[in-house]
Structure formats: structure tokens, C-alpha cells
Amino acid sequence: FAGKNFNLKFQHYNFLGWKHRLAPKKDEWSKFDVQSCLFIFCMRNPYSWVQAMHREPYYDHYPKIKDLPLENFIQFSIEDYENCIAMWNQKNDSYFRMSDEIPNSIIINVEDFNVDQGKFHANIADILNRHDMPLVKMNSYVNGRGRHEQKDITSSLRVPKYDEKLVRIINSSLSEETMKKCNYELLI
């Protein structure tokens, strides 16, 4: 979106690592030219995110992780994280921290972006002081494997209807503070 609308270059993994990583701390990112970068941090509702993560986990080194029922997957320890919800909390907290430390950043809830791309186009235009750029909407689903025209973005972002037990399991690891920072509400 930012590349198409504002002719921005994407920095690859040799610049501060993998896009899904925990945001680097100042002693790491300060070694790079962050002054000329716009960092775009994308947040996703943890209730729809965990379902997507279950379907296509970042951590697929454990061959049977995709075979776990959702309840077991949510409680499965991933790398240094107690579970995927703890990972969601820590990663999003790290994005807020880094956003506060660096000169140019924007935090976007993907659900809000999907509803009103014009608002985010205007926010980025303000940051870049480039109000002459027309809005080119992004209407296809994009992930690390590329663009997917057949995937319905709105339905993939919709919060699933979980049973009470699953909601309790998810909520037991969710940080209310992080949820508030992300403008999400706990399911009850």
C-alpha cells in the first residue's frame, strides 16, 4: 500500500530482520538509518489473528503444530513465548515501544485499514508531507507468500464465534493493557 501509493521502497530482512519479529530495541535499531524510514506497524485483533496463526503458523518447525486442535495450539509454547497469545502481547508491546522511540512511524489496525484506506493514506501523506499522491486502494489479500486475489479479506479479519471455554483460554493470556493500546476489546 505504502509502496504503491507513495513510491516507497521496502527494506528487506537484512534491515532489522524478519517483519514478524519482536521489534528491536534502541541499541539495535540505532545502528541503522531509521531517520529516512517510515515504519508501519500493523496490528490485528488477537481473536482473528490466533485463528489465522493456527491455519498458517509462523513457527512450523514443529511438524505437527498444524494438526493441533485450536485449543491445544493456543496453549502450545512457541519459541521463547509461553504461548501464541503471550507472543501477540509481547510483539505488539514491542511495536508500540519502538514507535515511541523512532522518528517516523504509524500504527495501523488492519481491520480499520480494511474499512477506510483513505484515512491511512491521509495519515501517511501527512507524515511524508506528500499530499499530491492519489489513493490506490489495496483490494487483495497480501502475506509473505504474495498477493492472493481469491481470499476474502473482510471474512479473514472477522472475529470468530468461539465457545466460552476457548474465550477464557485466550483471555487468560491476553494483556488488557495491550488490548487497550491496540483499541481492541476483550470478548466476554
Please provide the spans of the model-predicted regions.
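Short, surface-exposed basic-aromatic patches at helix termini and helix-loop junctions that form
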Residues: 30-34, 122-129
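PAPS-dependent sulfotransferase catalytic domain
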Residues: 1-126
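PAPS-dependent sulfotransferases, especially Golgi type II membrane carbohydrate sulfotransferases
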Residues: 99, 126-188
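Short acidic alpha-helix initiation/capping motifs at coil-to-helix transition points
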Residues: 27-28, 114-119, 147-148
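A structural signal for well-ordered alpha-helical scaffolds and beta->alpha junctions
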Residues: 43-46, 88, 92, 117-121, ...
